[in-house]
Amino acid sequence: MVMIYDQDGNVLVEDRLNPTWPGITFPGGHVEADEPLVDAAVREVWEETGLKVSQLELCGIKDWLEADGSRYLVLLYKTQTFSGQVKSSREGNIFWTKLADLKQLKFASGMETMLEVFLSPKYSEHYLDTTNGRHDNLLK
């Protein structure tokens, strides 16, 4: 997942169309077999937004345990180095908004906690604790 921002205080967001995880988030997606993680983030941003990004800075991770015991990791990057024209995709509607106004939008589940990892140097992990049938968002 990549937070793309500019020098004017804007961030690029995606209003996801997928009914299993709707709401405002940043672009991102899955890693293909034998694909470096940064390359996957760059590719997903291109596919979902039409922008070419570079100089990604790793902010932290989001992680949780799946029901089968496997661990799922999402790497959280940010960059202000991009080129191209913004376009929406089948994943969602893409648009710029002021970072100061971001929390007024309807976030996808967990996005508000992930945003803390993107913005605060005191956090590097958003752990989704799924023990005891609950979904607790923890910052580390």
Label every PLM stretch briefly.
Residues M1-V11, P27:
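Conserved N-terminal beta-strand and adjoining loop/helix that marks the start
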Residues V117-K140:
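Charged phosphate-binding loop/patch that engages nucleotide di/tri-phosphates or the phosphate backbone
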